[in-house]
């Protein structure tokens, strides 16, 4: 619930503030997880009032990776390299634009691979 209002789980939003060509604020609202995350440039990132950070995982064998638009990736020259990487991972998922970026911000995923990223995907 946000501000006392209960939101349907499928509703989700990511909002970013761009000032003078620089991102200064990002907000990710994920009612499906009951979470609200935000980050301010130079001030860190927060999830429901507690400090968060991306995952510290440093070994491929422990890495959880989420992908987006594998069809576009499969049509490019990096497909074979991606295929060689997959067996080395702990897990491979395909959560999709909103969900995998939200999970990445709170450290629940280690890596996101998108073959056609645009600013709307990553701004928040």
Regions found by a protein language model. Give the residues of each.
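N-terminal subdomain of lithium-sensitive/metallo-dependent phosphomonoesterases centered on the IMPase/IPPase/PAP
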Residues: 1-11, 80, 84
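A generic structural signal for short coil/turn motifs at secondary-structure boundaries
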Residues: 3-4, 73-75, 114
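Acidic beta-strand-loop-alpha-helix segment within the catalytic core
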Residues: 14-102
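Short secondary-structure boundary segments
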Residues: 69, 115-117
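Glycine- and other small-residue-rich loops at beta-strand/loop junctions that grip anionic moieties
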Residues: 93, 114-115
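Hydrophobic residues within well-ordered alpha-helices
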Residues: 102-105, 123-124
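Alpha-to-beta junction loops
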Residues: 106-111
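Acidic donor-binding loop at a coil-to-helix junction in glycosyltransferase catalytic cores
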Residues: 120
